[in-house]
């Protein structure tokens, strides 16, 4: 288990080119090819994971299944994102299409949250860069819809994440970016957007 540090930024579309030039000037390079990412988030009927995240409680977790729709070789990752007093870490396991279908139908049982069913679908485009030991991801064209609901909401802003192990100093890199740090969860943001009006 490796704890990690995450910092998130909101960037307006009109500032994206400036941001990319900035990170390129300090030595950031492409880590992977850009790709489309799809995640289905699970929660219990009371949305306790959502509520814990909104309130910033520790420990808390999010459960999702992630895949990359445009990949020729389709695969699915069952992921647990866990936040604790000690730090954050992620546990994931590759699962088959059959197992994914079973989880969507039957749900996932969690010791703390009980039976969790699919709640929210999120799809977006992600770019991957790296600077020293800090991984930088840029998420654009973020779309949300409640599971089994055709109503789609889009996010106009761009989300940037800086991620590194807890032993690395991320603050020095973060200070080079004149953008606002935020607490942000795609799961919570999607639920909020889709519940407006």
Predicted segments with their positions:
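Phosphate-end processing signature that detects enzymes handling 5′-triphosphorylated RNA
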Residues: 1-197
């Amino acid at each position: 288990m490796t704890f990690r540090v995450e910092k998130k930024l909101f960037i307006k579309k009109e500032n994206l080119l400036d941001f990319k030039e900035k990170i390129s000037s300090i030595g950031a390079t492409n880590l992977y090819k850009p790709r489309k990412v799809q995640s289905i988030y699970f929660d219990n009927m009371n949305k306790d994971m959502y509520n814990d995240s909104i309130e910033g409680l520790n420990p808390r977790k999010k459960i999702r299944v992630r895949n990359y729709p445009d990949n020729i070789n389709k695969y699915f990752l069952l992921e647990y994102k866990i936040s604790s007093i000690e730090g954050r870490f992620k546990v994931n396991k590759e699962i088959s299409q059959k197992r994914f279908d079973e989880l969507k139908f039957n749900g996932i049982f969690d010791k703390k949250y009980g039976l969790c069913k699919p709640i929210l679908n999120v799809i977006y485009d992600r770019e991957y860069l790296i600077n020293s030991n800090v991984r930088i991801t840029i998420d654009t064209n973020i779309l949300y819809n409640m599971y089994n609901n055709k109503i789609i909401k889009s996010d106009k802003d761009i989300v940037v994440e800086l991620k590194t192990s807890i032993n690395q100093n991320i603050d020095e890199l973060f200070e080079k970016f004149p953008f606002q740090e935020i607490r942000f969860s795609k799961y919570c943001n999607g639920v909020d957007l889709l519940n407006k009006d």
